[in-house]
């Protein structure tokens, strides 16, 4: 009876379920360890991690609901999800809530969330539907490329204004989906050339028109005082659109400089956390210091989010960090195996798009933690402490499990036919 009940709940590919639960286990351990600053502010050792566990439980419930949705309903929901994404992105651009200098959140029904998280899934959903609808024996029709660009046009710029790294991540995932969908190489080559030129132009504009926000801040000014001062400033519409240039320029300069920073110039919310993340990695070893024994978590303001992989390396060592990375690789290859068994193109493209989205974001986070790329602000999926992003990522896994169920049913039908 118990086995039957569990079987009805944990449907779909068992390997993906195992990967998900291992990631959640690592998340609970590391968020509890890395949330020392939050526990101090909350005056409770357990409050931050209990809130995180509650979000994971809600995410699992949403995941179970999603995996019971048949693939054809995802296809039917595409225009509505796209419309919702565009409306909420416009909403956040006009009247969104600002945190740490970035206007990325809106409040809906008492819940604060980032519309860009929904927009990522909406773009993957739309791209999968376009690629599947316009597939031919030789690959995707030329019209597929144009339709995908038409869908990207209203969404990517709205995301890019406040979250450049998310826009870049989304574009990379869509490009990989078009590769999988066999979009003509000539079109992809032209797109790649345009993107390279656009990125070069953007970097030039950022370096030319962005200001060094660190140099302009008064000495010894706290983050709270900076935030209050920012709120008092009256910014024009143009300044509100391009205000992130300063942040992008600062991050590029810091990444390229690689020079020692004088103690009086250290910003505990920016410079120090990168330095201490590097110290956390450098002082680790093969086995690590053990869960809960991090020495650098108190000096990294985003130890539970953007830089949690550095804390994982410090506490779990090279072996633990490699194990976590392998979980994402297993998720990607397992989803690829599921996609290869799908009878129709849409669920295959949809599942692979979601897997690429999650794994590419994880790769971004890991590269930031070890200093390979500038700080992006991308959390580590399923491990970093998050809000609605955690729940939405669980929905993405639920959608992959839904595809695995349909592929499994196909295999069972084929097996029954062969037996007959």
Give the positions of each predicted feature:
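Long extracytoplasmic/lumenal interhelical loops at the membrane interface
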Residues: 265-319, 346
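Hydrophobic alpha-helical transmembrane segments of multi-pass inner membrane proteins, especially
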Residues: 21-33, 43-269, 310-371, 395-399, ...
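Helix-boundary and loop/linker segments of multi-pass membrane transporters
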Residues: 8-10, 143-144, 297-300, 343
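Transmembrane alpha-helices of multi-pass inner-membrane enzymes
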Residues: 19, 25, 373-409
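Transmembrane helix boundary and interhelical junction motifs in multipass membrane proteins
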Residues: 163-168, 289-292, 304-305, 373-376, ...
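Residues that form generic nucleotide/phosphate-binding pockets
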Residues: 8-9, 255, 280
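N-terminal membrane topogenic signal
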Residues: 1-20
């Amino acid at each position: 009876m118990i086995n039957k009940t569990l079987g009805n709940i944990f449907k779909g590919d068992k390997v993906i379920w195992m990967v998900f639960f291992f990631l959640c286990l690592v998340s609970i351990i590391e968020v509890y360890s890395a949330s020392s600053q939050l526990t101090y502010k909350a005056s409770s050792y357990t409050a931050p991690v209990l809130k995180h566990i509650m979000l994971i439980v809600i995410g699992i419930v949403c995941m179970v609901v999603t995996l019971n949705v048949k693939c054809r309903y995802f296809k039917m929901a595409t225009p509505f999800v796209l419309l919702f994404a565009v409306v909420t992105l416009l909403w956040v651009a006009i009247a969104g809530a600002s945190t740490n200098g970035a206007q990325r959140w809106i409040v809906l029904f008492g819940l604060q969330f980032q519309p860009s998280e929904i927009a990522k899934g909406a773009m993957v959903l739309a791209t999968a539907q376009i690629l599947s609808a316009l597939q031919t024996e030789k690959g995707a029709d030329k019209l597929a490329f144009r339709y995908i660009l038409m869908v990207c046009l209203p969404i990517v710029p709205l995301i890019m204004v406040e979250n450049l790294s998310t826009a870049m991540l989304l574009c990379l995932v869509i490009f990989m989906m078009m590769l999988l969908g066999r979009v003509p190489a000539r079109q992809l080559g032209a797109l790649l050339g345009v993107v390279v030129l656009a990125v070069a132009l953007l970097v030039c504009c950022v370096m030319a028109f962005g200001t060094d926000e660190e140099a302009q801040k008064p000495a010894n000014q706290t983050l709270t005082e900076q935030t209050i001062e920012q709120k008092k400033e009256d910014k024009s519409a143009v300044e509100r659109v391009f205000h992130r240039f300063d942040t992008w320029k600062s991050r590029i300069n810091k990444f390229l400089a690689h020079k020692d920073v004088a103690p009086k110039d250290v910003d505990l919310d920016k410079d120090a956390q990168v330095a201490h993340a590097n110290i956390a990695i450098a002082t680790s070893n093969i086995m690590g210091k053990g869960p809960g024994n991090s020495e650098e978590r108190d000096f990294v303001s985003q130890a539970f989010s953007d830089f949690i992989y550095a804390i994982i390396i410090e506490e779990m060592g090279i072996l633990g960090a490699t194990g976590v990375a392998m979980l994402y690789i297993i998720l990607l290859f397992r989803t690829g195996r599921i996609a290869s068994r799908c009878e129709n193109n849409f669920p295959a493209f949809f599942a692979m798009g979601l897997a690429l989205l999650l794994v590419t974001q994880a790769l971004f986070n890991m590269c930031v933690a070890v200093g390979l790329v500038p700080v992006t602000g991308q959390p580590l999926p399923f491990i970093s402490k998050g809000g609605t992003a955690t729940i939405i990522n669980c929905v993405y896994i639920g959608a992959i499990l839904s595809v695995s169920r349909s592929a499994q049913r196909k295999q069972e039908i084929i097996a029954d036919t062969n037996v007959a």
